[in-house]
Amino acid sequence: MYLKYLIGTLFSFSLVFGMLSASQSDFVSILLWLVPVNVGYFLLLYLSKNDRSVSFYLFIAVVIRISLVFTTPNLSDDYFRFFWDGNVSIQGKNPYDKRPSELITSSVIERDHYLFRHLNSPEYHSVYPPFLQYLFKYSVKMGNNRLDIDLLILKVFYALFSIGMVFLLPVILKLYDLKPWRAMIYLLNPLVLIEEMGNLHAEGIMVFFLALFFLFLKKFP
């Protein structure tokens, strides 16, 4: 009975604290972190499959997502481009119009130069869709030129969709006569958690809207 609480707690702490200390260039440390985390993940899948209720596992999924809001994306530097695009938007410019390397030559704004130095794709046009551009723009606008606040606000936006999936996925599985424990395959998946809430990659938002599609498909055939 208490095994799930022990494994769930260890899994949550390991994933979150590993994200806090992870380094993109240290492969060995990442491997030593992810191996036990994935072992914990598969143990939780096994336990949830044989448990009468999945409430505890859903609780873990929410707690981890909230905790990851307060971490820095140590395994990806893509977020600098997010805030570059947001910065361009609040200056009244089109983030798709010019490449960062073209815009920086005429900018005297210190924040622009700071973000530009951290970009991994200064020679490329933005690839992020309009919906994400709005999230980037309002994160920067609400953050008042503080990168740490921008990051926190954007993570809160992402968390709304991610936590939405925690509530949405079990409902969808029930509509399709599938066991609720199967939701944990996605909701507790370390790769999903790290990429979606840790590194701020937007695939989780797309999955949320895909899930809505399947919900409406069943509700309104």
Language-model segments: residues:
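Membrane-water interface at transmembrane helix exits
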Residues: 20, 45, 136, 140, ...
